[in-house]
Amino acid sequence: MTIKLIVGLANPGAEYAATRHNAGAWFVDLLAERLRAPLREEAKFFGYTSRVTLGSEDVRLLVPTTFMNLSGKAVAAMASFFRINPDEILVAHDELDLPPGVAKFKLGGGHGGHNGLKDIISKLGNNPNFHRLRIGIGHPGDKNKVVGFVLGKPPVSEQKLIDEAIDEAARCTEMWFTDGLTKATNRLHAFKAQ
């Protein structure tokens, strides 16, 4: 099993760029930078894309330019065009159930109320069996405050922790292609930014 498409979820536009909900895009932006593969807008895939080599694999990067709840449109367009199966996709997204400074890989599962994941599952024919990179952003403590929280900007102290976790996640994603998922997962899951 190899990953052929790495997606970073986000809302488009400058007003959302620094919000917690865009943590997935921060990850893909960093990966593109590390691999010197700038993202370019590609209308037919409804997003910013790039092509990279990881290990010996040809991998596409994607940050949808749709709103979060329509992310599946971009993912399905790219998956269909390049004949990529759900289990060959890694979707990076913000995760309320993990604290800032932590990131974890996961295969399959529900959407946990995340509208981006919900739409991707739906557009992939109700198939949830894609890989996820869950980037911890913490939880406001009250479910009624979640929308304002994910669309808010983290304070500097939390941003630093999130950035460190994303940095480690980028290293571990590269490691996945050279040393395998088990090693990459063990390393990432042992990490906690201080």
From Swiss-Prot:
Its EC number is 3.1.1.29. TRNA binds at residues 16, 67, 69, 115. Pfam families: Pept_tRNA_hydro. Its main location: cytoplasm. It catalyses: an N-acyl-L-alpha-aminoacyl-tRNA + H2O = an N-acyl-L-amino acid + a tRNA + H(+). Keywords: Cytoplasm, Hydrolase, RNA-binding, tRNA-binding. The record marks 94 as: Stabilizes the basic form of H active site to accept a proton. It is an enzyme of class 3 (hydrolase). GO terms for molecular function: peptidyl-tRNA hydrolase activity; tRNA binding. HAMAP family: Pept_tRNA_hydro_bact. Belongs to the PTH family. Hydrolyzes ribosome-free peptidyl-tRNAs (with 1 or more amino acids incorporated), which drop off the ribosome during protein synthesis, or as a result of ribosome stalling. Catalyzes the release of premature peptidyl moieties from peptidyl-tRNA molecules trapped in stalled 50S ribosomal subunits, and thus maintains levels of free tRNAs and 50S ribosomes. This is Peptidyl-tRNA hydrolase.
